[in-house]
Amino acid sequence: MKHLLKMLDMSQEEIIDILNLADQLKYELKHGIPHPMLKGKSLGMIFQKASTRTRVSFETGMYQLRGHALFLSADDLQIGRGEPVQDTARVLSRYLDGIMIRTFEQKEVEDLAEYGSIPIINGLTDFCHPCQILADLMTIREFKSSFDGLKMCFIGDGNNMANSLIVGCLKVGMSVAIACPDDYQPDKEVLDFAAQYGDKFQMTNKPLEAAKDADVVITDVWASMGQEGEAEKRKKAFHGYQINDEVMAQAHEDAMVLHCLPAHREEEITTKVFEAHANEIFEEAENRLHAQKAVMVKLMA
């Protein structure tokens, strides 16, 4: 594994290896055991999309691994002033040991990997969010012990989260049910991938149907960054796609709820459900740190 570009590229073995290492790193951190696995290494962090959790978790993770993280905003790079991505990739490869990029276009991430000579980590694109899904899988296994026999239900926008959850959960052996409005379905490439799993994958526009017998229920905001102009239109389209008591009544009694945050309470999830599952949601947020540290060690050590 040379890069982390999208979940579609990862094998089940690679996913499990990262989760196992993430568990180990989490244990060591909690018990004060140093792990300077990236001592002397430098990670460049490119942010075309702002983020609290991504920046803090990667920067803190590199510090705990005894490496150095360098924040690069769009204003710090020549890409915004016309330099081709392939040139930026080749220059940064001479200075850094790895790049994490959070941006809009998946192609930009793929181009960095193609033209650079160092590991590239996808911190989020409009197509996928692999770091978040690794944290989600880590959290699910932490609370449920294994993936065997579990069903994951996602309700809401068929966005980067849905795309990555479908692939990641199917690859580790879970069943997957997705409920989205017809005009907001996941990417065709992802649906084609899921089709090979037969009845382990269900696509519907009925949230209650998707939530039936679910062990894990997940949602995301209705309007992602860059879609603020569509907020009112999306509120109408996603009316009825809220995680609430009615939805949770369809899931198993001990079902988990996850949300990648930030949450818009009383839109995609009620405050009551959010607070009832806050322990799981904030453990998921913490696990971004541990999962991303595992990714960096695997790619950069």
What are these regions (language model features)?
Residues 92, 112, 209-210:
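Structural alpha-helical scaffold elements that stabilize or flank donor/cofactor-binding regions
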Residues 97-168, 259:
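Anion-binding alpha/beta catalytic cores of soluble intermediary-metabolism enzymes, centered on
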Residues 195-271:
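Rossmann-like adenosine-cofactor binding region
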Residues 254-255, 261-301:
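Adenosine-phosphate binding glycine-rich loop
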